[in-house]
Regions:
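Extended, aromatic/histidine-rich regions of cofactor-dependent oxidoreductases associated
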Residues: 1-191
Length: 191
């Protein structure tokens, strides 16, 4: 299996999906209405700003926003960055090579005036698929769908320059309130 390769003792090649515990639970997605999609292998478009990002500190002035984008559907076509929680977008520069199914670096020049701001990035692939907001993601998928979670990760820069998770809590769901959980926010768990 792909989950515990360190315990590999033998390899069995088959032309059918493995029906092992980890493959059936981790590669199964639950939709918002409770339907189950088994064996969803492809990761939809995703991007993440790596600078500035959580735990870092920045000073007012000019900065180069940097990050990574990828898609399981092929080549990244563009990445956009928002400084106002998605009301407006600026196109980032993709650094070559831009290959199908591969990480692509992006960058965008930006001046920070020292006021609180929330940064978002979103990726688009060559098939027209785009990265959803958290709200869009959870209208489609269950709140515990963390293995294929690809919603926009927000970074909030506070006036003192600290960069923290900028995701807003989502409110009540089937398992109570869901908010940002440690790390980069990529793990979405009911807390």
């Amino acid at each position: 299996g792909s989950i515990q390769v360190k315990w590999l003792r033998r390899i069995l090649v088959t032309d059918l999906p493995a029906m092992a515990k980890d493959e059936t639970s981790e590669y199964t997605d639950v939709t918002a209405d409770g339907r189950v999609l088994a064996f969803t292998w492809v990761m939809e478009p995703q991007s993440i700003i790596t600078y500035p990002s959580g735990g870092q500190r920045v000073q007012p002035g000019f900065h180069e926003i940097r990050g990574l984008a990828w898609s399981g559907f092929g080549r990244i076509a563009k990445v956009e960055v928002s400084f106002d929680e998605g009301r407006t977008w600026r196109k980032a520069v993709l650094e070559p090579p831009v290959e199908p199914y591969a990480f692509v670096r992006f960058k965008l020049q930006w001046y920070w005036d020292g006021k609180e701001v929330v940064l978002w990035s979103r990726a688009w692939d060559e098939k027209g698929n785009t990265q959803p907001t958290r709200e869009e993601f959870f209208r489609r998928w269950s709140r515990n769908n963390r293995y294929h979670y690809n919603a926009i990760q927000a970074w909030r820069i506070l006036p003192d320059g600290r960069v923290v998770n900028g995701d807003r809590p989502l409110g009540q769901g089937a398992f109570g309130p869901v908010g940002p959980v440690g790390g980069c926010g990529g793990e979405v768990l009911d807390v």
